[in-house]
A protein has these predicted regions:
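Conserved Radical SAM active-site core
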Residues: 1-55, 61, 66-70, 214-218
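N-terminal [4Fe-4S]-dependent radical SAM core
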Residues: 12, 154-197
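Short, well-ordered coil/turn segments that N-cap beta-strands
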Residues: 14-17, 39-41, 76-80, 92-93, ...
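Non-cysteine beta-strand/loop elements that form the S-adenosyl-L-methionine
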Residues: 40-50, 79-84, 92-103
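Flexible glycine/acidic-rich beta-alpha junction loops that bind and position SAM and/or redox cofactors
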Residues: 55, 88-90, 95-118, 145-158
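Well-ordered, non-membrane alpha-helical segments in soluble/globular domains
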Residues: 58-68, 94, 119-131
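C-terminal scaffold of the Radical SAM
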Residues: 105-132, 137-140
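Local cysteine-cluster metal-coordination motifs and their immediate loop/turn environment
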Residues: 192-212
Length: 218
């Protein structure tokens, strides 16, 4: 998101190919999914097993897992991408794996948790554990903006705004190139980001989009 490049975005279904929602808790949206029936869309649902010391304002993990399943049952497993438990094996077709970026403004919070930069060998060990965990299940594993090449482990570099998935959901080809405004390791196609910093209430220690200003977000 670039706060210096703000514009008015039309949400007319005639000009919207697809909407991708990033969320850790879409529960409030479930009763209103019918309002989205005019649009083609899918979800990037981040679901981690961390405790309240890391993700301190989220609902209990068991509740979020149930939300994931309900969302998948409502719109289909191909349209709910799990961002980092075989427990979800029947409810998603893909898991996106990412590793923490040590942005300057979150180093203090990460330091308090004893979290430092990851070495290449540590990344590979964790990636291998995901490969083993998902091997028995029909869940594709891809990375998101990971600088370490993990293809030798069978993990390709994926994309959050996925041309193939958007085209399958929309039902027609998409005329979009790789987004040149993202990091070089990002493979996503061009899109328009609707949102802004300092608005999320989840309070995750590793979040780069909120600099601890919860009052502003509230």
């Amino acid at each position: 998101f670039n706060p210096k490049a703000v514009s008015r975005i039309s949400l007319d279904p005639a000009v919207v190919d697809c909407i991708v929602f990033w969320t850790k808790n879409p529960a409030p949206m479930l009763p209103r999914l019918r309002e989205l029936e005019r649009y083609k869309y899918y979800f990037q649902f981040t679901l981690n097993p961390y405790g309240a010391d890391v993700e301190n304002r989220l609902p209990d993990l068991s509740r979020r897992i149930e939300t994931f399943k309900r969302l998948s049952d409502a719109i289909g497993r191909d349209r709910v991408i799990w961002r980092y438990d075989p427990i979800l094996r029947d409810h998603t077709a893909k898991c996106m794996l990412g590793f923490i970026d040590h942005y300057r403004h979150i180093r203090g919070a990460l330091g308090e948790l004893g979290v430092g930069p990851l070495r290449r060998d540590e990344i590979e060990v964790m990636a291998q554990s995901f490969v083993r965990a998902l091997e028995p299940y029909p869940i594709a594993l891809e990375t998101c903006t990971v600088k370490v090449d993990l293809r030798h482990l069978g993990i390709p570099s994926g994309m959050c705004i996925d041309r193939g998935l958007v085209e399958r959901i929309a039902g027609y080809p998409i005329a979009a190139k790789k987004d040149k405004n993202q990091r070089q390791v990002c493979n996503s196609i061009e899109s328009i980001d609707v949102g802004t910093y300092e608005t999320c209430l989840n309070g995750c220690a590793y979040c780069y989009a909120l600099k601890g200003n919860y009052n502003r977000a509230e």
